[in-house]
């Protein structure tokens, strides 16, 4: 009887241990399956009742984790019909071509960005995506110069890169000051009844004066739109040289802008990478005469060598790099002395990490850097944080900067600026002013009973 009782006790003890072991396995599995930091939802937010062109074009990406944490990034619509824009965004969110750091076989610079591996945003944590490495392919002796490849090319798509990174950095808890000088970018034309026309000198004065009164100490004038239409109507195709008549129109606008800017503001002229060597020279001479601080991007990357030779004809400072996708391109531009200021586009070059690396390259070469961000306040702040306090940074350029200073705008707390320098540490949108549309969602599998 005693033996049987002991046996029963042992059996019961074993059963209890087994149940406990199974329960612990179930708990461990449940814990493993529960990933509170995993991104499961991507939404697109648009302003319900836009009061300006900036607000009507603003798009905000919201990434949400299983725990309910959210991260935000923004960009501007890029001309696609709404359904195509949403489909494009969903595809890019689900396959984010994160940059990697690979040894560049052509130069000693190790930061050349390789492509080839896509990384999924949904189903991963922000930390995993931001730190993902691209796949090594031993024996492959070539890295694509196109940067992120064809899926990232096309009007406006590069803006999505910095937008997604801004949202991921927000989720990852990226904080800190964004102390950089701001430079709003404005066009020299305006739209009327569906067509674009050049501004009048008086209109240009008013626009620059308004920015000056808002506290900005630099302004960037974009030469595109109406000017390109004029050249096309003349049967010209890039690279071209503006005829004297068109140069005269530009000259009047530069003179008006400089008069309004006075000595308190720098005036920057941004060409559209569409000029020939003669075209660049003639425009540079006009800029010199109007005491323009910097002429940006007069020629495309494919004319890098020609630009290096042609700039010997004038002393106007040149910025370069608006269409560069790789650090190698900047290194070659520096080697050929094609300019004194590196002007990387945050989207084209690959986002925050590569903007920082470009600034490092400028510092090593004893040059300066003036990045361009084609996004709203969230993307602007993400880039500003990465460059805060660096002496080689002249300014950070983006459109509609004055809109983000307004008290009644789409931000809960508007951006703050002192003496033309951004002093805001954080930026939060007012979600009550936005409408939300679900773009992508990961299916969460329920536990089997």
Language-model-derived ranges and their functions:
Residues 75, 184-186, 221-223, 269-273, ...:
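A cross-domain feature marking catalytic cores of carbohydrate-active enzymes
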Residues 179-308:
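Metal-dependent enolase-superfamily TIM-barrel catalytic cores that perform enediolate-based chemistry
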Residues 64-170:
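Metal- or metallocofactor-binding catalytic centers and their adjacent structured scaffolds
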Residues 29, 33-59:
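Short, Gly/Pro- and small/polar-rich lid/capping loops
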Residues 12-23:
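Bacterial N-terminal signal peptides
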Residues 91, 285, 291-294, 302-422, ...:
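Shared catalytic-loop signature of beta/alpha-barrel
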Residues 2-14:
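Bacterial N-terminal signal peptides that target proteins for export
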Residues 151-194, 214:
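Glycine-rich, aromatic-flanked loop segments that form ligand/cofactor-binding clefts
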């Amino acid at each position: 009887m005693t033996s049987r009782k002991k046996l029963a006790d042992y059996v019961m003890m074993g059963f209890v241990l087994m149940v406990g072991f199974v329960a612990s396995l179930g708990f461990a599995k449940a814990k493993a399956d529960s990933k509170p930091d995993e991104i499961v939802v991507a939404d697109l937010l648009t302003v319900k009742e836009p009061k300006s062109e900036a607000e009507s074009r603003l798009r905000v990406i919201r990434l949400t984790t299983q725990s309910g944490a959210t991260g935000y990034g923004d960009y501007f619509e890029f001309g696609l019909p709404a359904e195509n824009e949403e489909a494009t965004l969903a595809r890019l969110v689900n396959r984010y071509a994160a940059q990697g750091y690979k040894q560049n076989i052509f130069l000693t610079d190790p930061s050349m960005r390789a492509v080839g591996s896509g990384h999924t945003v949904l189903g991963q944590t922000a930390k995993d995506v931001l730190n993902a490495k691209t796949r090594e392919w031993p024996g492959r002796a070539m890295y694509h110069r196109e940067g992120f490849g064809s899926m990232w090319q096309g009007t406006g798509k590069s803006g999505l890169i910095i937008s997604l990174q801004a949202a991921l950095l927000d989720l990852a808890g990226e904080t800190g000051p964004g102390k950089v000088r701001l430079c709003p970018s404005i066009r020299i034309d305006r739209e009327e009844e569906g067509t674009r026309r050049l501004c009048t000198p008086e209109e240009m004065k008013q626009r620059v004066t308004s920015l000056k009164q808002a506290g900005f100490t630099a302004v960037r004038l974009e030469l595109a739109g109406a000017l390109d239409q004029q050249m096309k109507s003349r049967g010209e195709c890039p690279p071209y040289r503006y005829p004297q008549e068109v140069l005269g129109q530009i000259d009047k606008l530069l003179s008006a802008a400089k008069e309004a800017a006075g000595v308190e503001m720098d005036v920057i002229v941004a060409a559209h990478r569409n000029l020939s060597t003669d075209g660049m020279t003639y425009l540079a001479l006009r800029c010199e005469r109007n005491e323009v601080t910097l002429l940006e991007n007069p020629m495309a990357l494919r004319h890098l060598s020609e630009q290096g030779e042609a700039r010997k004809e004038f002393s106007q400072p040149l910025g370069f790099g608006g269409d560069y996708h790789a650090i190698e391109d900047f290194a070659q531009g520096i080697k050929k002395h094609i300019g004194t200021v590196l002007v990387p586009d945050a989207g084209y070059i690959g986002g925050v990490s590569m903007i920082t690396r470009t600034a490092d390259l400028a510092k090593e070469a004893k040059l300066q850097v003036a990045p361009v961000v084609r996004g709203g306040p969230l993307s602007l702040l993400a880039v500003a944080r990465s460059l805060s306090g660096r002496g080689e940074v002249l300014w950070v350029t983006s459109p509609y900067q004055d809109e983000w200073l307004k008290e009644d705008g789409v931000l809960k707390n508007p951006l703050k600026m002192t003496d033309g320098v951004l002093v805001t540490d954080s930026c939060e949108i007012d979600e009550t002013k936005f409408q939300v549309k679900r773009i992508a969602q990961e299916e969460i599998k329920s536990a089997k009973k």
